[in-house]
Amino acid sequence: MLVLTTETIPGKGIKEVKGLVKGSTVRCKNIGKDIASSFKNLVGGEMNSYTEILTEARQIAIGRMVDEAESLGANAIIEMRLVSSSLAAGAAEMVAYGTAVIYEDA
């Protein structure tokens, strides 16, 4: 599955637009790692546990979006975007969305 943030696929033509596809996940912090990150917040530096959570959330959301596109028979997703939001204390949502298409050689 080709996943692009662009509107077009260089050297290819869009044969059919399948529609909007999306994937999301809500991730919570681990209390032990959260305490360690709180100390890091005091002295500065990267909060590795939060970076890991966001990386995992992106991968899951994109994977779910790709699964939805494949179920529609698409072979690419164009105009893919990622959005994150804080839902509650210690929880964050990651959403991936884009347009599922079938492309062919131009």
Curated annotation (Swiss-Prot):
Pfam families: YbjQ_1. It comes from the Bacteria. This is UPF0145 protein CPE0882. Belongs to the UPF0145 family. SUPFAM superfamilies: YbjQ-like.
